[in-house]
A protein has these predicted regions:
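Glycine-rich beta-strand-to-loop/alpha-helix junction loops that act as flexible
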Residues: 60-64
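Structured mid-to-C-terminal alpha-helical surface segments
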Residues: 1-58, 68-80, 84-319
Length: 319
């Protein structure tokens, strides 16, 4: 029924969101991490971005891009990661872009007051990958939903951004926007693992690679393989990411070895993450590293040569 015939559209949206959770297959535990009101606010911001003059400036990356691909199989995320194209910008410039996006009409009964946008620099413009943190608020009637963005610069996207369809919540048509290719997601997360080594506290990256290795996206995007990630494209994405980031390949054997998989600091972090995310039914860290070793690890150890074949998520090996 069109909203103009609904006496209280805001109340109607809240009720319909509960039905959407069932349709997406999201569990109560997942909704504790990312409530539907938050997902609706994410959709509202991304929809405004899609309609704004800044649509070509940003590419969705991180957990939100995986949630859009894998739906209930994905990891719920509380923030949005955006890769900004072009040279690094000041926090004030980023704030100006975001305020213009917030002012874009979208028709979902959400309001993003531009005057509530707050920004701060997480990594300075002089860094290899400057990052600006953005905080804003989505208003739905009298309710308030904080939204947090991380806008990063200096990202090399290979083989190029692809068109992603965000899971549709209540609105008639899904939001379509540019997103990281899956090979790039794997390459950057794996590069960060090599760089951080035992100091790594980003357990969500291990979770993501374990999940990507075990499942093809239910709805692959245009240009993405429906039957396994191509080894050659992953190798090219890795080579570019390693070069741009200055990833120390000398540390690669340790990351892929037994000492890392059993390191007390890392396994302790994983145990806490695993308990907090019990809904995902994650295995022991050694098992996770076994999958990562077989998936991006094999490709990384062949560089600069390029492997052929594709990844089999059922057999957990390259074919």
């Amino acid at each position: 029924m069109p909203d103009r015939f609904v006496k209280n559209p805001v109340a109607s949206i809240a009720a319909r969101l509960k039905n959407e959770a069932t349709a997406l297959g999201l569990t109560p535990a997942q909704l504790q991490v990312m409530p539907l009101q938050m997902a609706y606010a994410h959709q509202g911001f991304l929809g405004r971005l899609d309609l704004s003059p800044h649509a070509e400036r940003f590419v969705l990356k991180g957990g939100a891009s995986l949630f859009a691909r894998y739906r209930d199989l994905g990891r719920p995320t509380r923030d949005l990661d955006l890769a900004a194209q072009g040279p690094p910008a000041t926090p004030e410039e980023v704030a100006g872009w975001i305020r213009e996006i917030c002012a874009q009409p979208f028709g979902d009964h959400l309001l993003f007051p531009p005057e509530e946008v707050q920004v701060r620099s997480v990594a300075p413009e002089s860094a290899a990958h400057p990052v600006v943190n953005v905080r804003l608020t989505a208003h739905l009637g009298t309710s308030r939903q904080p939204v947090e963005l991380d806008v990063s610069f200096g990202n090399v996207i290979h083989p190029g951004a692809c068109l992603l369809e965000y899971p549709r919540l209540v609105i008639p048509e899904a939001v379509r926007l540019r997103a990281y290719p899956l090979e790039q997601v794997v390459a950057e997360k794996f590069a960060a693992m090599v760089e951080l080594n035992v100091a790594n506290t980003r357990m969500k990256d291990f979770h993501d690679l374990w999940q990507i290795a075990r499942h093809d996206p239910p709805s692959p995007l245009p240009g993405e393989s429906a039957r396994g990630m191509p080894a050659r494209e992953l190798g090219e994405a890795m080579a570019r990411s390693f070069q741009v980031r200055g990833t120390p390949l000398a540390d690669l054997p340790f990351l892929l070895g037994e000492d890392f998989a059993t390191d007390p600091a890392v396994t302790g972090n994983w145990a806490r993450y695993r308990k907090k995310n019990a809904w995902a039914r994650l295995p022991d860290f050694r098992d996770v590293m076994g999958v990562i070793r077989a998936f991006p690890g094999v490709v990384a150890t062949t560089l600069p040569e390029r492997m052929t074949g594709s990844w089999d998520p059922t057999a957990l090996r390259w074919r």
